[in-house]
């Protein structure tokens, strides 16, 4: 329980897991990871929280024999936009499930020169450009004012485990980087990307905040394993990492259906091309991401 939050606010987790099945790690899947391949003995449970509904049911199971719980951040049909995600409910429900740590898997747009499509990266810093989101559990007149130390938003030990896991399976990855969290759901302008680069951002995403801060409020170690989907707007494509192919078209990760919706349901040839390129980058990166994730989970058991 968090100091200052009344016991009456404690959520009820439907059919709560037994101690034997209590998950060691909570895995949050983003764009490109709507389901967790390799998850065995899967059973889903609906979580109820004082903060409302989660993005979907929690998927309990075993990954490489280790009990874990998985939650698709955008919903299992990728139906929830970044600014509409109930981050408080998601993080709270995973904590109540009994996890010891959270690993967030995300797709990002690369700004730094070495963050090419298909590259994996473990960021170490965040700049928050979001607004209007529910950013804290300590909100309202009946709650105390709490200032968490957020100097280093990602847990150092958990980051090290992810990096060591990549080394153990022979998977190259970038071991640091500043994640710029934009509001979305639109993509960034070329001028904005220039600004983000001047600010020190190495990559762009839309979901790290307030997710990382909420995990810190609950004393949950939190780290991210991200896959670069493509280069941010206005930046040269450069060669793709690994087998991702040429996927450097400006813009960032957007599911095919979202591109169509943004254009009133009609897609032109360029949008089709963008969706295919992003899909190719993520298709190439996801097996490598899952390899690293699985190894990290076994190290945390």
Where are these regions (language model features)?
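Generic secondary-structure signature for well-ordered alpha-helical cores
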Residues: 99, 125-127, 131, 163-171, ...
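His/Asp/Glu-rich mid-to-C-terminal helical/loop segments that flank catalytic regions of hydrolases
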Residues: 233-301
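Short, flexible loop segments at the rims of nucleotide/cofactor-binding pockets, characterized by
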Residues: 78-83, 180-183, 200-201
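Short, hinge-like loop/turn segments at secondary-structure boundaries
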Residues: 119-124, 221-224, 240-243
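A C-terminal functional module that forms or caps the active site or interfaces directly
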Residues: 187-235
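Glycine-rich beta-alpha junction loops
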Residues: 31-32, 109, 126-127, 178-183, ...
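Metabolite-binding pocket within alpha/beta catalytic cores that recognizes anionic/polar moieties
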Residues: 2-151
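Active-site rim beta-loop-alpha module in soluble metabolic enzymes
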Residues: 153-197
């Amino acid at each position: 329980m968090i100091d200052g939050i009344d016991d009456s606010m404690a959520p009820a987790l439907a059919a709560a897991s037994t101690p034997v099945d209590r998950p060691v790690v909570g895995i949050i899947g983003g764009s490109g990871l709507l389901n967790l391949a390799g998850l065995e003995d899967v059973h889903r449970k609906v979580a109820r929280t004082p903060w409302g509904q989660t993005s979907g049911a929690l998927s309990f199971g075993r990954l490489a024999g280790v009990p874990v719980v998985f939650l698709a951040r955008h919903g299992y049909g990728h139906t929830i936009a970044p600014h509409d995600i109930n981050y408080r409910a998601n993080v709270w429900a995973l904590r109540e499930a009994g996890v010891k740590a959270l690993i967030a898997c995300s797709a990002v747009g690369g700004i730094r020169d070495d963050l090419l499509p298909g590259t994996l990266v473990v960021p170490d810093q965040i700049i928050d450009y979001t607004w209007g989101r529910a950013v804290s559990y300590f909100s309202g007149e009946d709650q105390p004012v709490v200032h968490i130390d957020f100097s280093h938003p990602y847990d150092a030990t958990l980051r090290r485990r992810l990096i060591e896991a990549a080394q153990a399976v022979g998977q190259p990855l970038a071991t640091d980087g500043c994640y710029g969290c934009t509001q979305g759901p639109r993509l960034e302008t070329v001028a904005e990307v220039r600004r983000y680069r001047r600010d020190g951002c190495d990559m762009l995403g839309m979901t790290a905040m307030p997710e990382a801060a909420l995990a810190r409020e609950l004393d949950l170690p939190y780290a991210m394993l991200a896959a670069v989907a493509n280069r941010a707007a206005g930046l040269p494509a450069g060669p793709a990492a690994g087998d991702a192919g040429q996927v450097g078209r400006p813009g960032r990760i957007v599911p095919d259906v979202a591109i169509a919706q943004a254009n009133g349901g009609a897609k032109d040839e360029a949008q089709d091309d963008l969706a295919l390129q992003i899909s190719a980058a993520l298709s190439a990166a996801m097996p490598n991401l899952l390899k690293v994730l699985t190894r990290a989970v076994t190290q945390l058991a």
